[in-house]
């Protein structure tokens, strides 16, 4: 299965964290030299300087403020996941139910190759939000470490959620990038999990549902085509020498 780029929710997260920081800032904080540098850096897109300014500010004023949340978010934007994890985890000690911090911590754990810990976070997050995006991310991680029954349970829960046409996602196929409906992405992973549990007909049906939603969804089309190839070969197998075809996710694809 090709890696899905989980960016749209993060863009919303970044906007919400920054806007919340702006609303929560006191007049004294706005006049602080480090915050002035931070604001100037953000206005010019200089995230490196923004990080330095916030570190100086937090060093002086302490971490019990929303600028620490913003620092975690900027570290995530920069791909500095260990630093993002540090600050999101630290802030969750003070705000254990903050969904933005939970999301940043979970994604950081995944990027740091700690999928089990990331799954624990996203299970709690999805229970709070019932967000289709969080459902997809949880399924993706569950499938990645072959927690297939859990992945299917999450998929079944996600089917009860409301999906809107604007719920979309991007994905990579080799050097190319595609775009599809979030629900199609959920159907695709659901199909892979079912197929890997030897529920091949059900898995195929979910690939077909994904393609029905978006006929240009390359990953689902590849998986569906792989199943047809496997089925064709299975029909030609000598009954005295049966084979056990693998998952379509393991078939060679474009890289």
Where are the predicted features?
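N-terminal leader/linker segments that initiate helical-solenoid repeat arrays
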Residues: 17-66, 252-255
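Canonical positions in the second alpha-helix
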Residues: 56-57, 90-91, 124-125, 158, ...
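Terminal, low-structured helical/coil segments at or just beyond the last alpha-helical repeat
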Residues: 22-23, 177-255
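TPR alpha-solenoid repeat register
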Residues: 67, 101, 134-135, 167-168, ...
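Register position in tetratricopeptide repeats
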Residues: 43-44, 77-78, 111-112, 144-145, ...
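Residue-level recognition of tetratricopeptide repeat
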Residues: 64, 98, 131-132, 165, ...
């Amino acid at each position: 299965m090709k890696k899905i780029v989980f960016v749209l929710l993060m863009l919303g997260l970044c906007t919400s964290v920054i806007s919340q920081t702006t609303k929560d800032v006191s007049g004294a904080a706005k006049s602080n030299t480090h915050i002035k540098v931070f604001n100037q850096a953000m206005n010019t897109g200089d995230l490196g300087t923004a990080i330095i300014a916030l570190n100086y500010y937090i060093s002086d004023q302490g971490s019990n403020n929303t600028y620490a949340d913003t620092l975690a978010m900027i570290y995530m934007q920069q791909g500095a996941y260990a630093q993002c994890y540090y600050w999101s985890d630290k802030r969750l000690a003070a705000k254990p139910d903050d969904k933005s911090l939970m999301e940043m911590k979970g994604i950081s754990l995944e990027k740091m190759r700690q999928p089990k810990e990331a799954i624990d976070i996203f299970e709690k997050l999805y229970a709070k939000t019932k967000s289709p995006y969080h459902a997809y991310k949880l399924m993706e991680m569950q499938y990645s470490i072959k927690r297939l029954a859990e992945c299917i349970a999450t998929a079944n829960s996600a089917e009860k959620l409301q999906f809107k046409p604007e719920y979309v996602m991007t994905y990579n196929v080799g050097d190319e990038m595609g775009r599809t409906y979030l629900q199609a992405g959920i159907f695709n992973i659901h199909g892979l999990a079912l197929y890997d549990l030897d529920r091949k007909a059900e898995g195929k049906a979910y690939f077909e549902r994904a393609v029905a939603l978006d006929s240009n969804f390359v990953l689902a089309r590849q998986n569906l085509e792989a199943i047809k190839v496997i089925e064709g070969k299975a029909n030609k197998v000598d009954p005295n020498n049966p084979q056990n075809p693998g998952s379509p996710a393991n078939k060679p694809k474009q890289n």
